[in-house]
């Protein structure tokens, strides 16, 4: 959770969180070596959000284009990413609520044919 802290611009988040930077192939920003899945992205847009009245707030929406994906091969089965195997943790809302995904939560939902 250390990487969610607001820290001074010059402070190294990798050092603070005890994580290892890994070189990316297509972008200059490093990846997190300990993460089994990494996306390399290029900035598309930075949009300052506003109130309903159009007043700017101190919150930004950052959109990027994924230009490379790195996935630990142990998380792939027949080329398909196995979400539960990765045991991801998801933000659930509020200041401290999270969920963990495991295989017991899986269900199949077949999409209807497009008409």
Ranges and model annotations:
Residues 1-115:
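Basic, polyanion-binding surface patches
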């Amino acid at each position: 959770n250390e990487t969610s802290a607001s820290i001074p611009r010059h402070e190294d988040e990798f050092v603070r969180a005890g994580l290892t930077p890994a070189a990316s192939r297509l972008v200059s920003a490093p990846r997190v070596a300990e993460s089994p899945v990494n996306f390399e992205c290029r900035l598309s847009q930075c949009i300052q959000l506003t109130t309903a009245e159009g007043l700017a707030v101190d919150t930004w929406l950052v959109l990027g284009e994924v230009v490379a994906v790195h996935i630990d091969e142990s998380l792939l089965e027949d080329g398909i990413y196995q979400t539960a195997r990765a045991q991801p943790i998801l933000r659930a809302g509020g200041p401290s609520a999270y969920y963990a995904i495991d295989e017991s939560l899986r269900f199949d939902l077949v999409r209807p044919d497009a008409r």
